[in-house]
Amino acid sequence: MFILSGFADEISPSLDEQLAVLGAESISHLELRSVWGTNVADLDDMQIASLRRALGETGVHVSAIGSPIGKIRVDAPLPPELERMRRVADIARELGTAIVRVFSFFIPPGEPPERHRQRVIDRMGALAQLAEERGLILAHENEKEIYGDIPQRCADLITAVGSLALRATFDAANFVQCGVQPHAEGYGLLRPYLVYLQIKDALAATGEVVPAGQGDGQLRETLTALADSGFEGYLSLEPHLAQAGRYGGFSGPEGFHRAAQALRSLLDDTAARWR
């Protein structure tokens, strides 16, 4: 069964508005990337306590921490990133989730990713070891311009690190924007490692982000295959319909509603079970 979630900061910086829209959409989970205009990794203890109270009052749960870990250059110092990871791990524990989204480091422009393979593996291995110690699962997202931006390098990274604490999340739109056919070229390679999906779609011709099922992301095929295989996990809406950037995106309440409608329609068409 699929469980719907979403990046609530795509709705508004305001927690109250985020929770109101999620309630109106009957979405019971959120992926925490930022709130009150502050990135999740930078929230202080008082903010986390306030957030936890509000979630408890509304019955909304945290599906994952949409962290920025690994969204730095591969040659940037690692110790500060490990310290941020420790803080994110504390926040994940406080908010009751074991899943943390991560990235595999930006490659310097013009350089072949393979040149940095071992450094990426070593760095991701250090993050995975920390995750193992904290009982977390790192869900690696296939972001553009990082080492793991195409299916082959995503699979290579996960197998090379060799930790059950490092798994994959699947972002069809990002694959499209990297010139990949997500289902035809990516699903088979990554299915053994998939624990989570970021839901957005994109047009291959322009890279424009569109609602699920309205682009070239082959989401219908992927969702059908996952349902047929008995996948149990989250589908996290990340619409990017009003604004998309390297470190996040925005859709507004109306855009988020359009994205949620599109995903529900797609799920109904595939006869998948979801809630």
How should these model regions be labeled?
Residues P13-Q18, G56-E57, R73-A168, Q177, ...:
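Active-site acidic/histidine proton-transfer and metal-coordination neighborhood
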Residues D42-S50, A76-R84, E111-D122, E145, ...:
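Alpha-helix N-cap and loop-to-helix initiation/capping positions
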Residues Q47-E57, R123-L130, G186, E221-A225:
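Catalytic-core regions built around general acid/base machinery
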Residues E31-L32, S63-G66, A98-S104, L136-E141, ...:
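Short beta-strand segments at enzyme active-site cores
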Residues L32-L55, F105-E111:
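Glycine-rich, proline-tolerant flexible connector loops at the mouths of alpha/beta enzymes
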Residues E10-S12, S34-W36, P68-K71, S104-P108, ...:
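Active-site-proximal loop/turn and secondary-structure-junction residues that shape catalytic pockets
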Residues M1-A8, S12-S28, G56-G59, G96, ...:
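Histidine-acidic metal/acid-base catalytic patches
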Residues M1-S5, H61-I72, S104-I107:
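N-terminal small/glycine-rich loop or linker at the start of catalytic domains
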